[in-house]
């Protein structure tokens, strides 16, 4: 996957989290992950004041992205796996970094 394209989508995803735009956040996830949105939402700071893409590590068929979410009460880094669906990078897996 192309790093620049994935980074662009990841940055946009982070901004959606900052705005609390859950429809846009859900749009970045494959359908199978939608039931996990409430759980993921509990992990993230609320409100999220800042989302920062820390790294984008592309491979041939996917990219691993680390995004740090900072709020008033906590900071959480999420590791996500992005794959192209059609021509659009989408999150196919995500979990907090320990």
PLM region spans:
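Short, non-transmembrane alpha-helical segments in secretory-pathway proteins
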Residues: 18-20, 29-40
């Amino acid at each position: 996957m192309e790093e620049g394209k994935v980074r662009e989508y990841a940055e946009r995803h982070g901004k959606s989290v900052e705005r609390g735009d859950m429809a846009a956040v859900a749009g970045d996830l494959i359908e199978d992950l939608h039931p996990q949105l409430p759980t993921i939402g509990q992990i993230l700071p609320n409100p999220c004041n800042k989302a920062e893409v820390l790294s984008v590590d592309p491979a041939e068929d996917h990219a691993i992205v680390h995004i740090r979410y900072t709020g008033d009460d906590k900071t959480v880094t999420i590791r996500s796996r992005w794959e192209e669906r059609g021509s659009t990078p989408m999150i196919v897996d995500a979990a907090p970094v320990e």
